[in-house]
């Protein structure tokens, strides 16, 4: 079987996000180049080991492998996000946040893929920041490639 593009959407109530840092700060990793981060938040981006709204199951071991494969991109600060659900790679003019960390977290007996986001001081980032401040639910969308087997389980997954 050939890998296919898999897109998962996950609507998250703002109360499930945790604020790590607030206020306009300069990113320490960018050698004082005045790149402004509006705030840093952590929150769930998808459910693990359970069927998603699209009828697929992402097992923990597959997600852990995908995170490991993405480590160099995360360290290079190259995992960009944007508002809405882009059809292609994020457009630099539409970037709202930078994903700096991905990990698995158990909440009330269920496992989730969590991410740490730096909300950027860009037009789209300011919109995302305002949505967060207003406690509006934030939808996340994961894009990856994998093979879906006959049991709806995703195999050989790449974020």
Locate each region found by the language model.
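Polar/acidic, low-complexity leader/linker segments enriched in S/T/G and N/D
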Residues: 1-75
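Residue microenvironments linked to proteolytic maturation
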Residues: 8, 100-159
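Generic recognition of long tandem-repeat/solenoid scaffolds
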Residues: 36-44, 79-81, 112-118, 154-156
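Short conserved beta-strand and strand-loop elements enriched in small hydrophobics
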Residues: 75-91, 140
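Short, surface-exposed loop and linker segments with low hydrophobicity and enrichment for Pro/Ser/Thr
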Residues: 29-37, 65-76, 105-109, 120, ...
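Short, flexible beta-strand-to-coil junctions
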Residues: 45-51, 83-87, 143-150
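A structural signal for short, hydrophobic beta-strand segments that form beta-sheets
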Residues: 11-25, 30-32, 90-103, 148, ...
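Intrinsic-disorder/low-complexity loop/linker signature
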Residues: 32-34, 54-55, 90, 109, ...
């Amino acid at each position: 079987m050939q890998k296919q593009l898999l897109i998962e959407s996950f609507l998250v109530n703002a109360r499930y996000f945790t604020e790590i840092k607030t206020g306009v700060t300069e990113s320490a990793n960018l050698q004082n180049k005045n790149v402004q981060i509006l705030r840093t938040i952590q929150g769930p981006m998808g459910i693990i080991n359970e069927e998603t709204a699209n009828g697929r199951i992402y097992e923990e071991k597959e997600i852990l492998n995908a995170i490991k494969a993405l480590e160099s991109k995360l360290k290079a600060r190259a995992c960009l996000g944007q508002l809405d659900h882009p059809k292609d790679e994020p457009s630099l003019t539409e970037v709202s946040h930078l994903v700096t960390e991905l990990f698995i977290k158990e909440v009330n007996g269920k496992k989730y893929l969590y991410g740490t986001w730096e909300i950027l001081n860009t037009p789209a980032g300011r919109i995302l920041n305002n949505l967060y401040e207003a406690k509006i639910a934030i939808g996340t969308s994961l894009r990856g490639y994998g093979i879906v087997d006959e049991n709806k389980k995703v195999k050989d997954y790449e974020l």
